[in-house]
Amino acid sequence: MKDLVKFLKAQSKTSEDFDVIKIGLASPDMIRSWSFGEVKKPETINYRTFKPERDGLFCARIFGPVKDYECLCGKYKRLKHRGVICEKCGVEVTQTKVRRERMGHIELASPVAHIWFLKSLPSRIGLLLDMPLRDIERVLYFEMYIVTEPGMTDLERGQLLTEEQYLDAEDRWQDEFEAKMGAEAIQDLLKGMDLEAECEKLREELQETNSETKRKKITKRLKLLEAFVQSGNKPEWMVMTVLPVLPPDLRPLVPLDGGRFATSDLNDLYRRVINRNNRLKRLLDLIAPDIIVRNEKRMLQESVDALLDNGRRGRAITGSNRRPLKSLADMIKGKQGRFRQNLLGKRVDYSGRSVITVGPYLHLHQCGLPKKMALELFRPFIYAKLESRGYATTIKAAKKMVEREEAIVWDILAEVIREHPILLNRAPTLHRLGIQAFEPILIEGKAIQLHPLVCAAFNADFDGDQMAVHVPLTLEAQLEARALMMSTNNVLSPANGDPIIVPSQDVVLGLYYMTREKVNGKGEGMLLQDPREAEKAYRTGEAELHSRVKVRITEYVKNEAGEFDAKTTLTDTTIGRAILWMIAPKGMPYSLFNQTLGKKAISKLINEAYRRLGLKEAVMFADQIMYTGFAYAARSGSSVGIDDMEIPAKKYEIISAAEEEVAEIQEQFQSGLVTAGERYNKVIDIWAAANERVAKAMMENLSQEEVINREGNPEKQASFNSIFMMADSGARGSAAQIRQLAGMRGLMARPDGSIIETPITANFREGLNVLQYFISTHGARKGLADTALKTANSGYLTRRLVDVAQDLVIVEDDCGTHEGLVMTPLIEGGDEKVPLRELVLGRVAAEDILKPGAEEVLIPRNTLLDEKLCDVLDANSVDSVKVRSVVTCDTDFGVCAKCYGRDLARGHLINQGEAVGVIAAQSIGEPGTQLTMRTFHIGGAASAAAKESSVQVKNTGTVHLMNAKFVTNDESKLVLTSRNTELTITDAFGRTKEHYKVPYGAVLSKGDGQEVTAGETIANWDPHTMPVVSEVSGFVKFVDIIDGLTVTRQTDELTGLSSIVVQDVGERATAGKDLRPTIKLVDANGNDIFLPETDVLAQYFLPGKAIVSLDDGAAVKVGEPLARIPQESVGTKDITGGLPRVADLFEARKPKEPAILAEISGIVSFGKETKGKRRLLITPAEGETYEEMIPKWRQLNVFEGEMVQRGDVISDGAETPHDILRLRGVRAVTEYIVNEVQDVYRLQGVKINDKHIEVIVRQMLRKAVITKAYDSEFLEGEQVEVARVKIVNRQREAEGKPPVEFERELLGITKASLATESFISAASFQETTRVLTEAAVAGKRDELRGLKENVIVGRLIPAGTGFAYHQNRHKHRLVDDVVAKLSEEDEAAIADEFVMTADDASANLAEMLNMADDAE
C-alpha cells in the first residue's frame, strides 16, 4: 500500500512539491546526469525524409520520438509498446512531449570558460583569482601563458608570460614549472584554490588594513569566497568541460514550403560549436602543430561564448541577413524574453475584444455584450447544456448546432450567461480598476456597451476605444469576480478613497441646469405640498424648472435604533431641486440638494450617500443620478454658439494700457536704467497681469446678467450662457479655455519652456493672424510631442514602483509598535493647503490624543480615525496628531494592518493579505501620464504668474520668525540676512494660521513676537534681483574688481550713470580666472571692519552677473544693498517639474549642487583656506572637531561663532535625501519624500493618499549597512535586509549578546528592486544576466515570498485570496516536518498494520483518488 501511495505521488509531479528554488553552478557530472546522450554531429534533419539525423541536434534516440508512441523506423507503433526501446533505431516508444524536456550534451575537447562568470562585471573568475579581467582574457584567448605550478623556480603562481618569456623560462628550468594557455590554465588555477585558507587570510588582512579602498576590495572578495564555501559550488565549475544541449522542441526547426527551413538561431549556434569541437578532436588525434590547435581552441571558446551570450565579447555572430543571432541569454532577458513575455504575462483563452459604445440605460453592474461574441466565449458551457438537456448526443453534434445558430442555442446562451460575470479590461491597465467584472446583457450589434459612470475608472471614452472581455471559468473565479471585482464593489478609488464613480460631462451639465435658480421665473413664489406636485407643475407648464418656490420637503433621519424618523419642513427651493429630491435615498439631508450642483457637489453627494447609507444605496443612487442627469441635459438644450463667446468691452483699453507700459520699460532699457534681463521679466509680468485683467473682465461679463425681478427692480443673477454653464458646472472646459475663446490667448511658450515676450492679443473668436498662428503652433506642437514621450516614461516609472513594492503584503493585525509620524496641517502662504483632517483620516492613532490644554484623553491609541472622530478633532481644534505609519511598522516581512490603517477602496481597516505594495505603486503610477513634462501648459500658453514680492497677512495674530538673521537699518526696519527664513502667523491659541517663506534681503516692518492685524503688509522685496546686504556701516573698498579683467563697466549715454557688472568666471581672460571680485567694508581710516561680535571680516564675494552701482570709497549704512544679482528670468527656471521630478525622488538621485548640511552639532569656525575652497570647522561641546572643504562660490548661511544643530543647512541647494536620512533620521526623510512628491501631484490637482508614498519609502529603506558586526554572521559594511538584522538581534538579545549595530540606507527604487532577496524577482526586472550570475555563484535560495516569484512558478500569489492558501501550505509544511521526525520504528509498526488484500487495496485506491479530486 505504501509503495502505491508513493507511486501515486510520483505521478502527480505538480508545482506543489517545493517551497524554495535554489540556483547554482552545474558540475560536469550533473550535466551528464541530465543528458540522454551525446550530440556528436552538427546535422539536424534529413532534407528529403524530414527525419532527424542520428546523433545530430534533433536525434530521436537522444531526445525521444518525433511521433507519439512510434519509433523512428516504424517497427513499434501504438500504446501497447510503451517504454520499449527499438533495437533497430534505438528510439524509445513514448510521447513526443519528452522532446521538450530531454536534454543532450556535448563533450568539449578542451575546457571553455563560461562567459557570464568571466565578463559579467565584476568578473567572478577575476575576483576569485584576484586578477584583472584583461589578463584573464589574454590567457583565455591564447595570447599569453600563465604559470599554474611554479615548482622550485622564482616564478610566481598566476604570473603571465609572453611567448618569449615562456621559451626563456623553459630553457632555464626545463620541466620544473608548469605554464599553460587557455581555459585549461584557468581551470587548473581554480582547482588549486583552497577556499577556506584564502578566507582566513583575507579576514586577517581585513583586520590589519586601514585604507578604505583596500577594505572594500577585500570585503568583496571575501563575500564571494564565503558564498562559494557555503553554497558548495566549486570554482572550477565556472569553466565548462561538458556543454548541455537544449531539448529540440525548445529550439524548433520547421520546414517551410519550397524546401526551405525556418530555424531557431540556437541551432546555428550549436552547429558552430559542434563543428569546431569535432575539428578540434580530429586535430588533437592527429597531433597537429600547436599553433593550429591553439587557434581551434580559441574558436571553440568564441563559439561557446556566442551560444551563451552573443555579443557580450567582441562582435556578435550574425546570421545570413546580417542580424545578430539570438543566444541563450537573449532568450531570457528583456521584454521579449522568457520572464516578461511568457512567465509574467500570458495570453489567455476565452477572451475577445471589440469597440465600446455608451449604454446609458444599463445598471452599474451591467454591460452589453454582442450576441456573436457571447456565443463564441461561452461555447463550452453551451455544449455542456445542450448535451445535458438532450438536444445533442455528442460534443460534435452540439458544435454543429451552435455553428448553425439554431433557435434553441440562443435560449441556452441566455440561460448560461445569467449571473455569470465577465471581466472587461481596457489597455493600458494602469491600476486595478482597469479590469472590472460586469453581468453581461445580450445585445444586437457588434460593439460592447459600457456604463458611462465606470468610464472614469477605465479612463475610457467612446471615440473608438476598444476593450477586451475575459470569461472567468471556475466557480472560484466567478465568485472572486462577483465579490471583489464587480463594478458595484469598486465605488471608491484606492488612490485617495474618494468615489471614482462620479458623473461627468452631460450628467453634470444636466444636474447643474436642473438645480439652477432664476430670478422671476414663471411660477415664482408658488406653495407646493410635495416634490410630486412640483414635478406636475413643471410638466404642465405652470412653472419653470428654475423658479424659486416653497415646497414641503420630508427628510428622513436615522435614529439610535437605526430606523428612519420623518421630518417635514417648508423649504425655499426651486422646482428642479424638488424634482431631484425624489430620487434621493432615505437618510440624506436636503441641504446637500438645495444648492446649484457642480461636479464637486455631485461627487460629495455620492460620497455622503456611501458613508451614510452603505454601498448598495450609493450605487443605486449613482445610477438614478445618471439617468436624471442625461434626461435634463437633453431638456436644457445647451449648445455652443459663436455669440456665446462674449468679448469684454474693456479688453481693448486693458491691452493698450499694457502696450504703453511696455513702451515705457523699453525706454528705460534704452536709457540703461534696467538690464535686458530685467526688461524681459517686467514685460512678461505686465502681459501676465493684463491677461489676468482681461480674463477677469470677461468672466464678470459672462458669469452675470441683469434681469428684472418681481418688484420690477433690476437684479443680477448667474448667467445662463451655455459656455459659462459648461465651465461653471465642471462639465467641460475651464476658465483658462474660455479665456482663449473670448479673452486673449496670452503669452506663449517656446518648446524649451522660455516665454515669448509678445503675447497673442487676439482670441479664437476674433481669429488669429498669420504671425499669431505661427507663434501658437510653436508651443502647442511641443505639447503633442511631449505627450507621446511622456506615456512611455510614466509606464516605466509604474513598472519600477510595482517591482520595488510588489512583495509588501499585510501579514498581521498589529505589530505593537508605539512609533509613528507626527501629522500637522500643511500651510502655505495665508491658506491651509491640506487640512489635518485629510492627513489623518483613515489612519490609526499611535498615542492617546489629548484635548488641547487639558489632560483629558479624546481618542485612545490604536483607534482608527474615521470621519466621526475627525469631526471630534476639528471640534477640539487639535493641530497635530501622531499616527501609525508603514515606515515605522515593526513587522518583519510585510506590514501590519494597524500601521496601514483604512483600506481606502473599502472604507474599513485593511484586511490581512491585501497587496498594499502593488496598490501603492499603481496609485502613484496611474496619474503619471497626467503629470506634464513641464509644469504648466494650456495649449502651449504660458501662465507666468506675476511673482510674489510681499507678505500681506490675512489673519490677526502674532509674528514668528524661524531661522532668521537680520540687521536693523536706519528706518528701524529689519533687513533679512538669512536664506531660508520662515515666517508664521499664529492665533491666540498658538495654532499656526499662515506660513510664508521670506527671501534674503527682504525688508520686514514687524519683528519676532509682534502683533499684526489682518490685511497688514509686513514684508516686501524685489522679486527680480537679489541684493547683497551690508551688515555693518562703513566705506566700500573694491578688491579684485579690475575693469576689463573681472568686471565690465557699463555707462548709460543718456543719463551718464555707470554701473559695474561682474563677469562670469567662464567669460574672463585667463589672468582674471583666479581673481575673486569682493567688496570689503572699511572704516574711515581704511582699517578692516569685522562683523559684530565675530572675528569675520565684513567682505562680500560677488558672483557672476552681479551689478554694483556704488563707487570705490562710497559710504554705506547698515542694511543697504551693496550690489544686486539679477534673478533668472521666469519660465527658464530650472525646476524639474512633473514626472521626472517624481522619478528623481523615488530613485533617490543626488541633485547637482546639493545643500551642505551640518554633520554634527557645534560651533562654526573657519580654518585655513585653499585656492578654491574654504575650510569649515564645527566644534562640538565634546569630541572631535569636524572639518569640511567647501567651494568658495557656495554661499554660506552660517557665520563664524554661530551654533548649528546636526542636519542644519550650511549652504543652500536642493537637499539630498541620503543626507537627510543620515543626519535627521527615517522620519525626516519620509516627510521630505512624501511632501516633495505630493507637491508635484498637487500642482496637477491629483489627489493621492500619503500612505502610498510611505509604502514606497519603506521599500526604499529596507536595506541596512552593518557598522559593527561583533561575532554575527554579517560582515562590516555589508548590505543586509533590515528585517534580517532585527531577527538576528532578537536572538542575540535572548542569548545576552550585544546587538549588531547598523545604519539604515536609502536605495533608489531600481536599486532596491535589484537588491531584493528573491533572485527570480530581480532577474525578471532588469539586468537579468548580472542577477542570475550573482545568484548562481552564491547558490542563492528563493523562498518564493513575493508576488512575482509565485506568478513565475505558476502558483497563487501570497496575497488576496491566495493568502490563506499560502498560510495553509506553511502549516502543512510544519506538520510534515513533525511527522518526518517520528522514528523509523514507528513507521515499521504502522506498516505492519497495513496488511491488506487486493480488494481492499483497490477499494482504498478508489477512495484516495476521490479524495484527490476533492482536494483539487
UniProtKB/Swiss-Prot annotation:
Mg(2+) binds at D461, D463, D465. It comes from the Bacteria. It comes from Haemophilus influenzae (strain 86-028NP). It is an enzyme of class 2 (transferase). The keyword Zinc-finger does not apply. Zn(2+) 1 binds at C71, C73, C86, C89. This is DNA-directed RNA polymerase subunit beta'. The RNAP catalytic core consists of 2 alpha, 1 beta, 1 beta' and 1 omega subunit. When a sigma factor is associated with the core the holoenzyme is formed, which can initiate transcription. It catalyses: RNA(n) + a ribonucleoside 5'-triphosphate = RNA(n+1) + diphosphate. Its cofactor is Mg(2+); Zn(2+). InterPro entries: DNA-dir_RpoC_beta_prime, DNA-dir_RpoC_beta_prime_bact, RNA_pol_asu, RNA_pol_N, RNA_pol_Rpb1_1, RNA_pol_Rpb1_3, RNA_pol_Rpb1_3_sf, RNA_pol_Rpb1_4. GO terms for biological process: DNA-templated transcription.
